[in-house]
């Protein structure tokens, strides 16, 4: 909860992503200490998803810093109009970070919370509150950076940046196309079903 609350008040884009990272590691700890199949499997998926999504968010921060020479959220706005390619990638990674269903962040967070509820209901309720805070600060950041009125007009992502960012969405959006069982929804269903039957 501490990481989420500190992220809520960050004016710096890089610090917000860093504190959101701390907050997401709480789901790993929660899943491990739940010590059941859902919790442990959820912790593994959160670690994998976190590595992909957070590195992509730091890449997005680097792109915007390269153009504006600042990381203050208040200095950006209107990037969906001025930098549509960048804003698309930032939106995808923001939604994956907050755990939107269908993206890589959802399965791990859901399993960690499910494992926590099985071990201790109070821990599950607290984890659910962290999900709400996470959605709050990530959506606030995306709204300010992408849709708020812009003070300047930085150019859109150039070819090398766009190609680098274009490789990241595939695993974030599920990974099942490459036979990746870690984030495959069928594996999630099987683990949950086996645990429910025991």
Where are these regions (language model features)?
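Hydrophobic transmembrane alpha-helices and their helix-loop junctions in integral membrane proteins
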Residues: 1-149, 157, 162
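Cytoplasmic/organellar membrane-interface segments at the starts of transmembrane helices
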Residues: 83-86, 140-198
């Amino acid at each position: 909860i501490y990481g989420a609350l500190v992220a809520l008040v960050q004016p710096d884009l890089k610090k917000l992503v860093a504190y959101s990272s701390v907050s997401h590691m709480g789901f790993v700890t929660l899943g491990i200490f739940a010590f059941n199949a859902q919790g442990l499997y959820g912790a593994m998926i959160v670690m994998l998803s976190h590595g992909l999504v957070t590195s992509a968010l730091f890449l997005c921060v680097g792109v915007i810093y390269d153009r504006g020479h600042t990381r203050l959220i208040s200095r950006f706005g209107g990037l969906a109009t001025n930098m549509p390619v960048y804003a698309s990638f930032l939106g995808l990674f923001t939604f994956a970070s907050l755990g939107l269903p269908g993206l890589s962040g959802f399965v791990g967070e859901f399993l960690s919370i499910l494992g926590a509820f099985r071990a201790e209901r109070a821990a599950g309720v607290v984890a659910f509150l962290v999900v709400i805070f996470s959605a709050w600060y990530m959506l606030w950041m995306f709204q300010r950076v992408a849709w708020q009125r812009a003070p300047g007009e930085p150019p859109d992502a150039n070819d090398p940046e766009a190609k680098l960012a274009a490789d990241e969405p595939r695993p974030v959006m599920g990974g099942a196309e490459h036979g990746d069982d870690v984030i495959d929804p069928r594996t999630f269903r099987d683990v949950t079903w086996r645990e429910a039957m025991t």
